[in-house]
């Protein structure tokens, strides 16, 4: 309760990135290589979904309209696409090493995965069930976060170092549009 500054309820999980959409909360159970779905009406875990082929699921983005979760697997450098209705992985792509964060541009239907090895992988969503790798290109080493402006489709990448020296810089990339 934000007005009373009081915890109303809690759900026991050990989790990273959490997204709430349409009465559900989606959670990466990183240490278990699983994905949880929590029902907000009951505050109970509705499902735990195994993520075969994904180790140390960390970053996550959602396509709420298409009912897909895009999950970066830090332990084996892949991105998996999870069908939230069927509760199964429908696609998998290699990424650079150290994939951490994921961002989804719903307008261009692109998934961005910055990686600590100094690369960013981009996957194109042709429709909810079909995906293809667009490219992996160089960015600064150690990048972890990315944001996409849904209007301009510019991609913002936070950099921790430049030319091997500590820095706090945001690089801006223009998305190539069809």
Predicted features and spans:
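Structural motif
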Residues: 34-36, 78-80, 119-123, 164-174
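A short beta-strand motif characteristic of beta-propeller blades
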Residues: 11, 44-50, 88-93, 132-137
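Short loop/turn segments that connect beta-strands within beta-propeller blades
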Residues: 39-43, 83-87, 125-129, 175-177
């Amino acid at each position: 309760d934000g007005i009373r500054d009081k915890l109303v309820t809690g759900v026991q999980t050990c989790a990273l990135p959490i997204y709430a959409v349409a009465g559900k909360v989606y959670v990466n159970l990183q240490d278990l290589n699983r994905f949880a779905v929590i029902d907000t009406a009951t505050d109970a875990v509705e499902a735990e979904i195994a993520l075969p082929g994904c180790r140390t699921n960390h970053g996550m983005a959602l396509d709420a309209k298409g009912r897909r979760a895009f999950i970066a697997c830090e332990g084996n450098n892949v991105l998996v696409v999870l069908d939230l209705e069927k509760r199964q992985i429908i696609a998998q792509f290699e990424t650079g090493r150290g994939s951490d964060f994921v961002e989804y541009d719903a307008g261009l239907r692109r998934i961005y995965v910055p990686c600590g090895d100094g690369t960013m992988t981009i996957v194109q969503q042709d429709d909810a069930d079909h995906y293809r790798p667009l490219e992996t290109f160089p960015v600064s080493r150690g990048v972890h976060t990315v944001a996409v402006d849904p209007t301009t489709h510019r991609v913002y990448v936070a950099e921790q170092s430049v030319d091997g020296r500590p820095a706090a810089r945001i690089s801006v990339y223009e998305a190539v549009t069809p």
